[in-house]
C-alpha cells in the first residue's frame, strides 16, 4: 500500500501517463436488482447513497495536508461541513474562475501551479455484516479535477477526468459497523490541460457518490443494440453481456418488456463462450443474445417509446443471482446518400449546446433543473442537445431517452489554450489520457437510444490522438456516427462535417482551417458527408440577428441538416452587492484576475432559466410546421417525421391590430404531410390595415407541456395601411411669441417652448403640467451590445469592432450646435424649423433639420431630415430620444410584439396591439446594453403622450448613457423619469458570432440621407 508521503512524492496529478489507479473498467451504470420485477420497474437495487454533509477542509496545496487526515482517529471536529455534491467555491471556499481560452495558470503541461488548492473530505458510513459477503464498490460520478481516495486509512486509488465516474472496489478495506472515507481533491491536475472548456473552473465532489453491492460473480457490463431491417419494420435485439469473472457454469438470460410491462420476448439461458472469436477460442466471461422482435414501436424524439431489457444471471442450478436492466429504444442511426438518418428519415437537427450550470450550485445539477431544461427545449422546438463539452450527469441521458431528445455525447476534452491548439493532440505521451476520456464515455452511455452521435471533444485541433479515439470508437460501436470539429470540421476523424460559426453565404478564409460558406461547403469536390453545425448563432446578450437565414438554407439544401446554437444558458453566478441588490456575476467578479469577463454570458436563457427574447425567435424559426397563404387558401406542411401531434388551429383576422374574427378547428396532419384549408374571406375597408394570424396549439397534454401550448405560428399582412390624407383641423390657429432666446407657442391649453440657442423643444405643457422631463434630441448611438464590442478589452478596443469605429467617429460624444431656428405662421399651423450641426472634435459629422408643425388642436407633426457630412461608419440608429415623467398606466402600442425585437430578429414578433409596464419593456441583460426595442410601431401611448407614424421604440427607466456605463444590472438605479427612444432606423444586432462584424449588410445603416415623420399629441386624460 502506498503511504501518504509516497503519494505526495509521486505527483500523479502531474503525470499524463497516469489517469487512474485501481479504478474499475468503465461500464454502464449498474444496480444489481435482486428480482425481475425490480429490474423491470427500475426500483430497488443495491445502491446506497453517500450524498449529504461531509467534513471538509481546504488547504493551499497538497503538501500542506496533514498526513494524519487519512487516519480514522483524526479529530475533524473543527472542520467545516460541506454538502456532497457541491463545488467548494459555491460554498464559500476559494474562488470561481472563468476563462474562455487561456488557462488560469502557467501553460507548462503537464505541470500545474505549486499553489494548488486541495480539498480534503471525510465521511463516515455504516455497513452491516451481511453486506460484507458481497463485492462493494464506490462510485464518484464527478470530481474536479483529480483525487486520491482512502478507506479506513488504506489508500484505495486515484482518478482524474472530472466528468466521468471513478469506481473503486472497497471490499478489502471495509469492516462491519462504521467506516471512514477520505478524499483528497486537487483543484489542478494535468487533466486540467484537457478541460479548458469556456466555463467556470470549479472544484470538488460535484456529482453523486454512492456504494453498490454485487455478488462476487456478477454482471459487469452489457451492450444493447437494436438492428432494424431494410424496411424499418422488424428488429433484432442484440445483447452482449460481460461477467465479472470467467465461468463455464453460469448462464445469462435476456427478456424484453414493453412500456406496459408485458413481456415481448425472452431468450434461452446461454452459457458463456458460445462464439469462438479466434484461434484461442471464445470469451468465457461473455454471452451474446439475439432476439427477433416483430414490429417494435420505434423510438424517436417525437415518439420516445421505451422498452425495458432485463438481463438475468443464473447460477449452476438455473436460479437467479442478480438482474440488471436498461431502457431500450428501437431505432437505427445511419448516414446514407450524404444524409444523417434516423429510422430511414433524414433528420433536421434543431439543436443547442448546453453547459451544466446552476446559478447557486455551480456545476451541480439536480433532477428538477434537468427536467426544466428539457421541457423548455421541447417547448421551444428543440430536438437535439450537444453535451458541451463533456459527458453530462448520468440522469440527463435517462431523461433525454424519456422525453425524446437527440444527444451528441461529447468527450471531456478541450485544449483551446494550447499553442498550437493541437500540441497535446499530437503528443503520444497524452494518447492514453485522450483515449480513456472517450472510452469511459462510450462505455457509460452506450445503451441510451438518445445518444445518436459520439463527439471526440472540442477545440483541440486535430492530431494522432484524435485518430486513435475515432478508430477505437468506430470499432467499439459501429452503430453511431462520430463527429469532431477540430482541424477544420472535415477531417478523416469525423463522419459529419461539423463546423462552428460558418456562415450561410460568406467564406471565412484561413490558411489552415478555412470556413466555407455553408452552401458551398457541401458542394466541395469529394465531399459527400452531411453538414451539421456543432456551434452557430452565438447568443451572447442581445443577439441572434438574421438567425432565420440559417433555417432558410437548412430547408433549401437537404445536406445542411441543422446545427446546435451556442448556447443554452447564461453562466452567471448569483451575487449580492452591499445594498442587498442581486445581480449575476461573471469573469472577474470573484477576484479572479485572469478572466474573460462576460464571455460566459451567451445563453438563450438567464441563469434562472427565464428566457431571453431571442428564444422566441428560435422557437418560431425552427418550428416544425410551415405555413403558406394564398388568401383565402391556407396550406400547412408538417416537418415532423415520425408522429402526428393532435393540434388545434386558431385563425384570426386583425383590423388595425384588433382581432375582429376568430376560427378554431381541430387538426391532424400526418408526419411529412400537407393540408390546405379554405378560409372564409372577409371584406376589407380600404382605410384600414388587416393581418391574418395562424396559430397551432397542442390539443392534448404532452410530457413537456400542457394542452394549449403554441407550437407554431405565422402572420401575414392582408392589406397594408394606406397613406391618409392630411387631417384638416378647424381649431383656432396657434399663437406664438418670442422672449429673448425663448419661443413659446400656445394652442388648446397646451404650450411649447423652444430655445433658439440650443434648438431644443425645452418643454411642453398641458394645462400647466410638464409633458417632458428632458427635451427631444437627435439620437445616433446605442449602449453597445456584446456583438458591438467584439474582442475589445477595457484598455484596448478591437479597431474593427463597432464600438471602436463608433467611438472613433465620436458618435457617443457629438457636440451639437444650433445653426438656425425659424418660426413661420402657416394656414393651419405654426412651423418651427431648426437646423442643427453635429461635430466630432472640429469636424462636421452630421446635419439635421427638425421641422415642427403645431396645429390648433395641439397636434404636433414632426419631420426630421438627417444628412451625413463625413465618412462615418454605419450608424447604430437614426432617431430621437427624450425623457418623460414616470406614468402609472401601462404602455400600449400597435406594432410588433409583445417581446423585444430588432430589424434582423423579428420573425417571431407579430403585429398587434399590446400593453406592458415599463419594467416588462426592459430586458435585464446581465451585461447591460441597448435593449427593449419594439419594431414597426404605428402608434404608441406612454402616459398621456401619443406617438403615431412608422417607427421603432424602446422605453426604459435607464438612459443609453446609464446602460453604456453599467457593467452589471445592479449598477442601474432608476430615477424619476422614463427614457423614450423613437427610431426611424435601427441597425441589426447581428449574431452569427460575437467577435467579428456579424450584422448582415441589409441591416446596416449606410445611407447618406434619412428622413422620418412622427405625429405627437397629448391626450386630455390617460385611459382607464
From Swiss-Prot:
It catalyses: Hydrolysis of terminal non-reducing beta-D-galactose residues in beta-D-galactosides. Mg(2+) 2 binds at residue 595. InterPro entries: B-gal_small/dom_5, Bact_Beta-galactosidase, Beta-gal/glucu_dom_sf, Gal_mutarotase_sf_dom, Galactose-bd-like_sf, GH-type_carb-bd, Glyco_hydro_2, Glyco_hydro_2_AS. Binds 2 magnesium ions per monomer. Binds 1 sodium ion per monomer. It comes from Vibrio cholerae serotype O1 (strain ATCC 39541 / Classical Ogawa 395 / O395). One of its GO terms (molecular function) is magnesium ion binding. Na(+) binds at residues 198, 599, 602. Homotetramer. The keyword Transcription does not apply. This is Beta-galactosidase. The active site is at residues 459, 535. Its EC number is 3.2.1.23. Substrate binds at residues 100, 198, 459, 535-538, 602, 995. GO terms for cellular component: beta-galactosidase complex. Keywords: Glycosidase, Hydrolase, Magnesium, Metal-binding, Sodium. It comes from the Bacteria. One of its GO terms (biological process) is lactose catabolic process. Its cofactor is Mg(2+); Na(+). The gene is lacZ. Transmembrane segments: none annotated.
Amino acid at each position: 500500500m502506498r503511504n501518504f508521503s509516497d503519494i505526495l512524492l509521486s505527483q500523479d496529478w502531474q503525470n499524463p501517463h497516469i489517469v487512474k489507479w485501481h479504478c474499475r473498467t468503465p461500464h454502464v451504470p449498474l444496480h444489481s436488482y435482486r428480482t425481475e420485477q425490480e429490474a423491470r420497474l427500475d426500483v430497488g437495487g443495491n445502491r446506497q447513497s453517500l450524498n449529504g454533509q461531509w467534513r471538509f477542509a481546504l488547504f493551499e496545496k497538497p503538501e500542506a495536508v496533514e498526513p494524519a487526515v487519512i487516519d480514522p482517529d483524526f479529530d475533524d471536529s473543527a472542520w467545516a461541513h460541506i454538502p456532497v455534491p457541491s463545488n467548494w467555491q459555491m460554498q464559500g471556499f476559494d474562488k470561481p474562475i472563468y476563462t474562455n481560452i487561456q488557462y488560469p495558470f502557467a501553460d507548462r503541461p503537464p505541470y500545474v501551479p505549486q499553489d494548488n488548492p486541495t480539498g480534503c473530505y471525510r465521511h463516515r458510513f455504516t455497513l452491516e455484516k451481511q453486506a460484507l459477503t458481497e463485492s462493494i464498490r464506490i462510485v464518484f460520478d464527478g470530481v474536479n479535477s483529480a483525487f486520491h481516495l482512502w478507506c479506513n486509512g488504506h489508500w484505495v486509488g486515484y482518478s482524474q477526468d472530472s466528468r466521468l465516474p471513478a469506481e473503486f472496489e472497497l471490499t478489502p478495506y471495509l469492516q462491519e459497523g462504521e467506516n471512514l472515507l477520505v478524499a483528497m481533491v486537487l483543484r489542478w491536475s494535468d487533466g486540467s490541460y484537457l478541460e479548458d472548456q469556456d466555463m467556470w473552473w470549479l472544484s470538488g465532489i460535484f456529482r453523486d457518490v454512492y456504494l453498490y453491492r454485487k455478488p462476487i460473480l456478477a454482471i459487469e457490463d452489457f451492450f444493447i443494440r437494436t438492428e432494424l431491417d431494410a424496411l424499418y419494420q422488424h428488429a433484432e435485439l442484440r445483447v452482449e453481456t460481460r461477467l465479472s469473472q470467467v465461468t463455464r457454469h453460469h448462464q445469462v438470460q435476456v427478456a424484453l418488456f414493453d412500456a406496459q410491462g408485458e413481456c415481448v420476448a425472452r431468450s434461452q439461458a446461454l452459457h458463456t463462450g458460445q462464439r469462438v472469436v479466434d484461434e484461442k477460442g471464445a470469451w468465457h466471461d461473455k454471452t451474446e443474445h439475439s432476439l427477433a422482435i416483430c414490429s417494435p414501436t420505434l423510438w424517436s424524439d417525437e415518439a420516445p417509446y421505451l422498452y425495458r431489457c432485463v438481463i438475468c444471471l443464473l447460477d449452476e442450478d438455473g436460479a437467479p443471482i442478480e438482474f440488471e436492466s436498461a431502457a431500450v429504444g428501437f431505432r437505427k442511426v445511419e448516414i446514407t446518400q450524404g444524409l444523417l438518418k434516423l429510422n430511414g428519415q433524414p433528420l433536421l437537427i434543431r439543436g443547442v449546446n448546453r453547459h451544466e450550470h446552476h446559478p447557486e450550485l455551480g456545476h451541480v445539477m439536480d433532477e428538477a433543473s434537468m427536467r426544466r431544461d428539457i421541457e423548455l427545449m421541447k417547448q421551444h422546438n428543440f430536438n437535439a442537445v450537444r453535451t458541451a463539452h463533456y459527458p453530462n450527469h448520468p440522469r440527463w441521458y435517462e431523461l433525454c431517452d424519456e422525453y425524446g431528445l437527440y444527444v451528441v455525447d461529447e468527450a471531456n476534452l478541450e485544449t483551446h489554450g494550447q499553442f498550437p491548439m493541437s500540441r497535446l493532440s499530437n503528443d503520444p505521451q497524452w494518447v492514453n489520457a485522450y483515449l480513456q476520456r472517450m472510452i469511459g464515455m462510450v462505455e457509460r452511455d452506450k445503451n441510451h437510444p438518445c445518444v445518436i452521435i459520439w463527439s471526440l471533444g472540442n477545440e483541440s485541433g486535430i492530431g494522432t490522438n484524435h485518430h486513435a479515439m475515432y478508430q477505437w470508437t468506430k470499432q467499439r460501436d459501429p452503430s453511431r456516427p462520430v463527429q469532431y470539429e477540430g482541424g477544420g470540421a472535415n477531417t478523416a476523424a469525423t463522419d459529419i462535417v461539423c463546423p462552428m460559426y460558418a456562415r450561410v453565404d460568406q467564406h471565412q478564409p484561413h490558411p489552415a482551417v478555412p470556413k466555407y460558406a455553408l452552401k458551398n461547403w457541401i458542394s466541395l469536390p469529394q465531399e459527400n458527408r452531411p453538414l451539421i453545425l456543432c456551434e452557430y448563432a452565438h447568443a451572447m446578450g442581445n443577439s441572434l440577428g438574421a438567425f432565420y437565414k440559417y433555417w432558410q438554407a437548412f430547408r433549401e439544401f437537404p445536406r445542411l441538416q441543422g446545427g446546435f446554437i451556442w448556447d443554452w444558458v447564461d453562466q452567471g453566478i448569483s451575487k449580492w452587492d452591499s445594498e442587498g441588490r442581486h445581480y449575476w456575476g461573471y469573469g472577474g467578479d470573484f477576484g479572479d484576475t485572469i478572466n474573460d469577463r462576460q464571455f460566459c454570458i451567451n445563453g438563450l436563457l438567464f441563469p434562472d432559466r427565464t428566457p431571453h427574447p431571442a428564444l422566441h425567435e428560435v422557437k418560431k424559426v425552427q418550428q416544425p410546421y410551415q405555413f403558406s397563404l394564398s388568401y383565402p387558401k391556407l396550406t400547412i406542411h408538417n416537418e415532423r417525421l415520425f408522429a402526428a401531434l393532435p393540434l388545434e388551429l386558431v385563425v384570426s383576422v386583425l383590423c388595425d391590430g384588433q382581432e375582429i374574427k376568430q376560427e378554431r378547428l381541430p387538426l391532424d396532419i400526418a408526419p411529412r404531410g400537407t393540408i390546405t384549408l379554405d378560409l372564409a374571406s372577409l371584406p376589407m375597408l380600404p382605410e384600414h390595415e388587416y393581418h391574418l394570424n395562424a396559430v397551432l396549439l397542442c390539443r392534448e397534454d404532452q410530457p413537456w407541456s400542457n394542452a394549449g401550448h403554441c407550437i407554431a405560428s405565422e402572420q401575414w399582412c392582408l392589406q397594408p395601411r394606406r397613406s391618409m390624407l392630411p387631417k384638416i383641423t378647424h381649431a383656432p390657429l396657434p399663437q406664438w411669441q418670442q422672449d429673448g432666446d425663448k419661443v413659446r407657442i400656445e394652442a388648446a391649453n397646451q404650450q411649447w417652448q423652444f430655445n433658439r440657442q440650443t434648438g431644443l423643444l425645452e418643454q411642453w405643457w398641458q394645462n400647466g403640467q410638464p409633458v417632458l422631463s428632458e427635451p427631444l434630441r437627435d439620437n445616433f448611438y446605442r449602449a453597445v451590445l456584446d456583438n458591438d464590442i467584439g474582442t475589445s478589452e477595457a484598455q484596448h478596443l478591437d479597431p474593427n469592432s463597432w464600438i471602436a469605429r463608433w467611438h472613433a467617429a465620436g458618435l457617443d460624444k457629438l457636440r451639437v450646435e444650433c445653426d438656425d431656428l425659424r418660426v413661420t405662421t402657416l394656414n393651419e399651423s405654426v412651423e418651427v424649423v431648426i437646423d442643427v450641426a453635429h461635430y466630432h472634435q472640429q469636424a462636421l459629422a452630421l446635419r439635421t433639420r427638425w421641422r415642427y408643425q403645431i396645429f390648433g388642436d395641439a397636434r404636433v407633426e414632426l419631420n426630421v431630415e438627417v444628412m451625413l457630412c463625413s465618412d462615418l461608419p454605419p450608424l447604430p440608429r437614426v432617431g430621437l430620444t427624450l425623457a418623460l415623467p414616470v406614468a402609472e398606466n401601462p404602455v400600449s402600442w400597435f406594432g410588433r410584439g409583445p417581446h423585444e425585437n430588432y430589424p434582423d430578429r423579428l420573425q417571431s414578433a407579430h403585429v398587434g396591439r399590446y400593453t406592458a409596464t415599463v419594467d416588462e419593456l426592459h430586458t435585464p441583460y446581465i451585461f447591460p446594453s441597448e435593449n427593449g426595442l419594439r419594431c414597426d410601431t404605428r402608434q404608441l401611448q406612454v402616459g398621456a403622450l401619443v406617438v403615431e407614424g412608422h417607427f421603432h421604440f424602446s422605453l426604459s427607466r435607464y438612459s443609453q448613457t446609464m446602460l453604456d456605463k453599467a457593467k452589471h444590472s445592479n449598477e442601474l438605479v432608476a430615477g424619476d423619469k422614463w427614457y423614450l427612444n423613437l427610431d426611424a432606423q435601427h441597425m441589426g444586432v447581428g449574431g452569427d458570432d460575437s467577435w467579428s462584424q456579424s450584422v448582415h449588410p441589409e441591416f446596416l445603416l449606410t445611407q447618406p440621407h434619412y428622413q422620418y415623420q412622427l405625429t405627437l399629441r397629448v391626450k386630455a386624460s390617460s385611459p382607464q
